[in-house]
Amino acid sequence: MAQHAEWNHEQAHLDETLQIVKNEREKAEADLGIVGGNDRMIQVIDDGSDDALVAQFVTRMKLRGLHQLRLSEKQPYFARLDFTPDAGAPVFGDLKPGVNSATYIGRWGVLQTPEYRVRVADWRSPVANLYYSGQVGRVSYEAPDGRVEGELTLKRMFTIGQGRLEGMQDTGLVGQEKFLTEALSQVTTARLREVVTTIQAEQNTVIRYDPMLPLCVQGVAGSGKTTIALHRIAWILYRLQKTVAPQQLLILAPNPLFLSYISRVLPDLGVNEVRQTTFAGLCQRLMGKRMPKLSQSARLSERLLMNKPARDALDDVLKRKGALSLRGQISRFLTEWEKSCIPGQDVKLGERVLISTEELRRFYLTDFRHFPLEVRVGEVRKVVVTRLKKAVEAASERLERTVEERLDALLRSMPDGPERRARARKLFDARDERLAQMKERQKTFLKEYDALWGSMDLLAVYAAFWRDMAARDAANLPVLEATLPALAKKRAVPEDLPALLLLASGLYGLKRTDIKHVVIDEAQDVSPLQVNALREVFRHDAFTLVGDLCQGIYGDEGLRSWEDIGQGIFGQSPEVARLSTAYRSTVEIMEVAFSVMGRHPVLGAGIAKPVLRHGKKPTLAVAATDRDRVAGIIRTVQGWLREGYAGIAVIAKTEKAARALHQAVVREIPQARHVTQGDDCFEGGVQVMDASLVKGLEFDCVAVSDADALTYPDERFYAKLFYVLCTRPLHRLKFACVGEPARHLENAPVERENEEGR
């Protein structure tokens, strides 16, 4: 292939840019006092003062900039735009109205000091939007000072490795797709990849959507939902860098393993300080010591062991626990509980009324109404304690006066002697005993007073809530029966958390939080009530929810439609953006996935369009015995390893089956690892795992080890699960079974292997 006509010019520009980056890196190291690249020598005095805090912040910012410069030394940019802004247009960097200028786009912006000239524009900058969404010709983009219109005359893409120009091409749509296909053909590592250089137009729209408005992203499997959500966070931090810190953005993921999977890409995007947790982890932080212990319920694993009637019954319970309508019921119940907790009698000390029922109600329901319930009880208690102290002090003073009067009478009536002294001692002893009794009575009085109020124990109130719901509607009785056993053990299950969070907010209040944008991944498995609870906790509409309705394998606990959260939660209905292009898997793999979901279509999920990247047909091996089945799987995995594939998943339906399979696989492939529900680190390599763990992950190759009709019945639930399994691999997909293959593969374009699985 002939070398590009401007190759030498671009190599010279790259060399010049790399020298500038090196100079800026050396300046940054000198500014920080770094010698020999040893960042550990940096020390900032921390004496708790405001000056020390400012110094720490400035140092962190400088270190972040230094890290970005070091990364830029390997690849300072990946694209070039030649753009001529119209006359009078607001401009960025070196752009001038009416002048055709070249702008280089990189993962990080590079400023040349001391004049602070933009040598490389950050991919998140407004002008970089032209790279992702513009084609040569008339274009425009939104800048802080207004809309910029003009003529885009060139889009050029570069491949740069370790500071050397390895490839370049001037792109229209065709060239860009070729560049994307080459990037997707690479072998995976044990981590999610950043895709700054290959963001597509539909993804770019999602990334740059208004950060203050709610957004739902319906993305087909392999459309880059998670990756794009992380890039959206990076863009938000760039866009709102003056008002939002990384710690004020939150990623909610389904489990610790998934968090491990995504966490390694965050430093590449400069967002490693963003908070990441699960919903349970967030509840722990918000509720503190009020957070109940959770039963370690592997819900999907349990569902996989159920028959359809049992699964349907569980789905009904989950649906009721996660329904948005439950929010109104919780509010109603708290109002009723609020009133039922008030003592129905005057609070007396002996015959003296310390606080009347009417006063209790006024303090509790009116004066302290702005406090949560338990805080109100505490505030009323302060009033009672104050009055109790005054009453005891008054009684003590009366007792002292009485003793003084009796002592005075004794002194006047009797001469000094043993008898008078004995009577005086008796008088003082009686006084001291009475004072001790009064002090002890204070303690017992307060215990008795506290017992007059209704319970504020979270799990007790939650149990009372479902008893109330069951009494109002017998259809809620199964929910009560399913909930009480765990509560009796002072535990809850994950699906209880949204309601518990709302109850805790009303009962005690929650710890304050300054989160300004929330990203919820795998949002199809989040209940409407959970979204509502999060909205109430954070008190803003800055939410990004990404998911795929086709992968909703947690039954009715999750969303059946994005319309489930379309009304009644946010200030305005969320925009629903669709990512319909599947980038992960080859055309041949996606054709199998389409066939699987075609048997049980999901309303509103959309139809996936695979990138035109071809590979080998998925295979189906029907073995005569289990031994043949496992042996065939092992041979296949060994073949994949010889071909150089790094990320391989061997999937069994259940954890028990995965454990047994791993025991067989590891004898022939020692590096094979058994991944379980409790693992919180995604390491890559050959991994044997059960079907409940793979959603959201991707691999080079996947072997579904038990793809028979008995293991995966022809039901909607199993169709969704099978679809998830089919859409995990980038390059290779194999099904193995003994007996009749799953009906999900009945019309799927798979290549049959012989019964020995060779």
Task: Annotate the PLM regions.
Residues 242, 256, 260-272, 277-281, ...:
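Conserved helicase motor core of SF1/SF2 NTP-dependent helicases
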Residues 1-15, 20-24, 28, 74, ...:
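P-loop NTPase Walker
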Residues 336-517, 530-531:
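Conserved helicase NTPase catalytic core signature
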Residues 220, 227-241, 250-251, 493-520, ...:
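Hydrophobic, well-ordered secondary-structure scaffolds
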Residues 198-206, 232, 329, 502, ...:
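Well-ordered alpha-helical segments embedded in enzymatic catalytic cores
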Residues 1-196, 200, 204-205, 743, ...:
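Extended, charged low-complexity regulatory segments
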Residues 158-160, 230, 341, 345:
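A positively charged, amphipathic N-terminal helix/segment that binds anionic biomolecules
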Residues 89-131, 271-338, 688-690, 701-704:
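Conserved P-loop NTPase-based nucleic-acid remodeling module centered on helicase motor cores
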